[in-house]
Amino acid sequence: MKLRVVILAAGKGTRMRSELPKVLHKVANKPMVEHVIDTARSLKPDAINLIYGHGGDQLKQAIAGDDLTWVEQREQLGTGHAVQQVIPHLKSSEKVIILYGDVPLLTESTLIKLVTASANTSLGLLTMTLAEPTGYGRIVRNERRSVTGIVEQKDANAQQLAINEVNTGIMIADSDKLKSWLEQLSNDNAQKEYYLTDIVAMAAREGINIATAQPDNAQEVEGANNRQQLASLERALQQRQAEELMTQGVTLIDPARFDCRGKLSAGSDVTIDINAVFEGNVVLGDRVVIEPNCVIRNSVIGDDTVIRANSHIEDAKVAKGCKVGPFARLRPGAELADEAQVGNFVEMKKSRLGKGSKASHLTYLGDTQVGEYANIGAGTITCNYDGVNKALTEIGDGAFIGSNSSLVAPVAIGKNATVGAGSVITRAVADEELAVARGKQRNISGWQRPQSKKGT
């Protein structure tokens, strides 16, 4: 049987107090609705319908995918009304899963449980059991434990309020039955809205066995209606990712102070200290050490490398046995070969540091290719930009660049060449040559400092 996923994403999110549609607020640096879409895609459905309303243009700009069919809900008249907009898209003999764009922690495994539980019936509900169910719609069952309906908190009697099995809103239904039930929905209630939950009682009256399944963790089905709940979801997702990494053998010095805002792959015996932030796709090799307060984005870090505190790495490749930082910045296109070292207040962009080479402090390397076992002295600057164009600096194997040197690109420093401290190099330096380009020192005997003129 074919599978369709319908995602409700039309809500304004007034309590967010934001111009941004609620579902575009981010958890782990990704819009909530994008988390939901990714989970839906993991099921490999035949179709995904995204129901939008408030901020539709913003939503379409932020979320892309050829597999998405956009369905507009011009008026927000309840969850049932939202799903009614999908009726023209429904095909016979489909299973239809209904999800919510502000419930980002739902997992593939939970949805598979729901699909499996409802395989032989026309309706399945994802429910959960709570010690404190206040605020949720209760799942009403008869003496045979069959689901007969859902009663909202405000409508429940004392006996129903004692029920601790609650509705999450997530369900799966046969398309033909769903269409029939949706067409029967009424807004004859105080809010004058069409409630999707009303189809449960319809199914029960038809004698349909309503299946149920529950998530492994109640946090999976929590939504965000305000900033506090958004922060709670953020911390819950970070804790989930931290648990997964520790299960795989990663040491997290404090899991409560860990942030992964993308995908992190780690080898064996990796250690991550506090307040490290990982964004995009990051790969850490075996025995990598990440010290406190580092930000690593879309980068690969090789085996036995140490990233010292307060370093920032983006779109970079760091090979085996390297040392980076503290307070180093590797910008896009930076590459370190095996055993290279970049120290404090060193910045690299579109540059490669060869095997065993060092730039230990206070250096800028832009559009630079450094060979093996070269030494870049403190304060070295590659002057790669003339105001219009960028130019390349080449530094050969074994070269030694003295402190406070400026290398004006395009320029090449040969193998085992030496540049004297304080030099401004504008022409090529041949292999094994010494280049000194600085003003001649002049010492003046008997010179006196200026004296203060009193009364002025």
Swiss-Prot record:
Residues 228-248 are annotated as: Linker. Pfam families: Hexapep, NTP_transf_3. SUPFAM superfamilies: Nucleotide-diphospho-sugar transferases, Trimeric LpxA-like enzymes. One of its GO terms (biological process) is UDP-N-acetylglucosamine biosynthetic process. It catalyses: alpha-D-glucosamine 1-phosphate + acetyl-CoA = N-acetyl-alpha-D-glucosamine 1-phosphate + CoA + H(+); N-acetyl-alpha-D-glucosamine 1-phosphate + UTP + H(+) = UDP-N-acetyl-alpha-D-glucosamine + diphosphate. GO terms for molecular function: glucosamine-1-phosphate N-acetyltransferase activity; magnesium ion binding; UDP-N-acetylglucosamine diphosphorylase activity. UDP-N-acetyl-alpha-D-glucosamine binds at residues 8-11, 22, 73, 78-79, 100-102, 137, 152, 167, 225, 331, 349, 364, 375. Residues 1-227 are annotated as: Pyrophosphorylase. Acetyl-CoA binds at A378, N384, Y385, S403, A421, R438. GO terms for cellular component: cytoplasm; membrane. The active site is at H361 (proton acceptor). Mg(2+) binds at D102, N225. Gene3D superfamilies: Hexapeptide repeat proteins (2.160.10.10), Spore Coat Polysaccharide Biosynthesis Protein SpsA, Chain A (3.90.550.10). It comes from the Bacteria. Pathway: Nucleotide-sugar biosynthesis; UDP-N-acetyl-alpha-D-glucosamine biosynthesis; N-acetyl-alpha-D-glucosamine 1-phosphate from alpha-D-glucosamine 6-phosphate (route II): step 2/2; Nucleotide-sugar biosynthesis; UDP-N-acetyl-alpha-D-glucosamine biosynthesis; UDP-N-acetyl-alpha-D-glucosamine from N-acetyl-alpha-D-glucosamine 1-phosphate: step 1/1; Bacterial outer membrane biogenesis; LPS lipid A biosynthesis. Catalyzes the last two sequential reactions in the de novo biosynthetic pathway for UDP-N-acetylglucosamine (UDP-GlcNAc). The C-terminal domain catalyzes the transfer of acetyl group from acetyl coenzyme A to glucosamine-1-phosphate (GlcN-1-P) to produce N-acetylglucosamine-1-phosphate (GlcNAc-1-P), which is converted into UDP-GlcNAc by the transfer of uridine 5-monophosphate (from uridine 5-triphosphate), a reaction catalyzed by the N-terminal domain. In the N-terminal section; belongs to the N-acetylglucosamine-1-phosphate uridyltransferase family. In the C-terminal section; belongs to the transferase hexapeptide repeat family. Homotrimer. This is Bifunctional protein GlmU. The lineage of its organism: Bacteria, Pseudomonadati, Pseudomonadota, Gammaproteobacteria, Alteromonadales.
